[in-house]
């Protein structure tokens, strides 16, 4: 999994930061998958500065309906049609996302030429394709808001081909059955159990992408043990009370949660426009004083999960 930050500013864009949008690249030689988390104004323009084609998007997850996370969506949907894209797209979001999209398309005389599914979600598991699952957790914010936990399913361990050959099992279709954990019978009557020749399963990666939030009950469960946690750090420690009063978090709160949840890495984003580059480094230092494995997301930053 690969994260590409298209927008990292809170509320309004700045000269160097657009409003919130994050790509999750799941593409692999044997599988497709390009997901977008939030779609603030100008997101499709930010996409033009990357190597990713909007036509490859197959899922969009909206955390909540505040404009800095949403207002880029109608334009992106229409541009996909104007480009002749026919790949289906599914949008997940809180109650009201369907009305927003359908109203924006209707009153602007727009449409989509590709299958578009809109799923209004609640807390709980919202998606599982057998490779990975996505679970939504309620955030603490003035509007209904969700954070998303993305978990890969464990992958089967490697098959010990050498041991199988030594046992007289010929390479070929039988190996595929054994890799699936099945038991086969050889021509000489021996039974071979695939589980005996498989290494331990490879744990899947886990990622938590928080929506806008102040401290909340679901935060620890959402973030527990993930490899990477993406969390807002809208304001610094000195302005924590102001951040919380508006349903946001401070640097201290983001870093303390990362430490308590035992995450591998914290990436902070959704930075107030009051902070210039020097101010952003101040935010990063505050987080690292509590949780050293912290990175600051800038627009177009790329992180591997």
Swiss-Prot record:
Signal peptide: none
Residues noted as binding Zn(2+) 1 in the record, renumbered to the chain: 64, 66, 141, 212
Cofactor: Zn(2+)
UniProt xrefs under InterPro entries: Metallo-B-lactamas, RibonucZ/Hydroxyglut_hydro, Rnase_BN, RNase_Z/BN
CDD domains membership: RNaseZ_ZiPD-like_MBL-fold
Binding site for Zn(2+) 2: 68-69, 212, 270
Catalytic class of the enzyme: hydrolase
Listed EC numbers: 3.1.-.-
UniProt xrefs under SMART domains: Lactamase_B
Gene Ontology MF terms in the entry: 3'-tRNA processing endoribonuclease activity; exonuclease activity; zinc ion binding
Domain of life: Bacteria
Keyword list, A-Z: Endonuclease, Exonuclease, Hydrolase, Metal-binding, Nuclease, tRNA processing, Zinc
Active site annotation, chain numbering: 68
The record's free-text note on cofactor binding: Binds 2 Zn(2+) ions.
Functional description taken from the UniProt entry: Zinc phosphodiesterase, which has both exoribonuclease and endoribonuclease activities.
Family stated for the protein in its record: Belongs to the RNase Z family. RNase BN subfamily.
Subunit structure and binding partners: Homodimer.
Name of the molecule in the record: Ribonuclease BN
